[in-house]
Amino acid sequence: METFANLEPEELVGWAFPCECGKTHRTALRALQIAPGALASLPAMLKTVNANRPFVLWDENTREAVGESARNALRIYPSFCYPAEPRPLPNERCLGQAVAAFDPACDLILAVGSGVLNDLAKMLGRVSGRPTGVVATAPSMDGYASNSAAMELSGVKTSVYTPAPVLVLGDVEVLKNAPEAMLRSGLGDMLAKETALCEWRVAALATGEAYCENVAALMRSALDRTVSSADGLLKRDGRAVQNVTEGLVVSGIAMGYSDTSRPASGTEHTLSHLWEMLALARGGRPAPHGLQVGLATRYMLRLYRDVAALAPTPARSREAYAAFRQEQWEAELRQVFGAQAEPMIAAALREGRNQPEPQSARAARALANWPAIRREIEASAARADQLIALMDAAGLPRHPGELNLSEADAKLAFHHSRDLRSRYLLTSLLWDLGELEPMEERYANLL
């Protein structure tokens, strides 16, 4: 089969790709344009997806960002506009506001914005049965074209699977004028693909999880394009902004192709999710997602060098597991996360995640495949200096305090990263091998 890894983003939509991995890769996306002046194409794109009466979901900031012409064109449709302050959050309350305002005569939910508005639109589409689309206003995150929404449900950061949008439009003239923090956020989210791709392959080796080399190559190609454009992003160079935005959109397409966020999300995203949960539980406002992910990626890339130097043994795995106590683990989660711990504990019990037989089987497989696992980790560690230099040049955060996080928060999130959900992370591997505690000490030294 001819690979799709090097196709232009617009060439990835409207097709089905039978693959050697056994899946036929496809996306619901039918209309995609990332270009200068793309807003002029919105009426034609709506027609392409058979949308005659979209319901527009935006906020006061994004309504202003798209400019007078687009604003006037969209005002003829039913809409709901969140205030600029307090900013909308991806939670039940803000979703309920959109549901209450929704016009059931509409045939498309059209978000005008970036992360939170896109997630709320997907959820509104999920509950209403309508397809969704998005007019992107910032190159800030990788969820535009994905088949999931990142929500805070009952205080727990959760990925809810939704149909992918049918329309994605990004006008480079709008995108390049996004706030600087959002430009940095998009870069952080894209550079995180290095660790996400590594951990996807590691999980496949350690657990037999499904993995697709072609989807991974597609994501790698988007990452490489972003790396080559990073210098121009904060200069608001149109070509650089377009390349990074296309990379973020391709990330979502890759998630849809694989029916999982694996190609784009690993331990670094889980750390970000936990930091968000801690901030919200204390009544705070989390830092932009991509800035958190960028900081977590910095730490993980540096830690990879130490992980690659490990020489794990069956005895070490057995010894560490023998010291594990389920009751103590549950009590610790409840102490840290309060009521938010209950769904985390319930999920682990359903999966038998901490039970002796699954742990022993995972450890045995990981040990048998350790040479291959180490090669994957070494390959990503070899790119650490280059990627961290790009982060530094772009002014991405270097320390937790820059994101209103304490070192204690950063340590806590790393310790509990394997507990948030069922995804097999690098920290899951370290726990199975009995190496999590020593790596926690190395991680703490990076902060």
Label each region the model flagged.
Residues 1-108:
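ATP/NTP phosphate-donor binding region
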Residues 2-19, 310-447:
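C-terminal charged capping/lid subdomain of soluble metabolic enzymes
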Residues 24-26, 49, 101-104, 125, ...:
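Solvent-exposed alpha-helices and their adjacent loops that cap or buttress functional pockets
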Residues 57-58, 113, 170:
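Short beta-strand/turn micro-motifs composed of small residues
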Residues 75, 156, 167, 173-180, ...:
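Generic secondary-structure signature for well-ordered alpha-helical cores
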Residues 104-124, 128-138:
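A short, small-residue-rich loop immediately preceding and capping a beta-strand
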Residues 128-225:
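A glycine/threonine-rich phosphate-anchoring loop and its flanking beta-alpha core
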Residues 218-378, 382-386:
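Active-site segments that bind and position negatively charged phosphate/pyrophosphate groups
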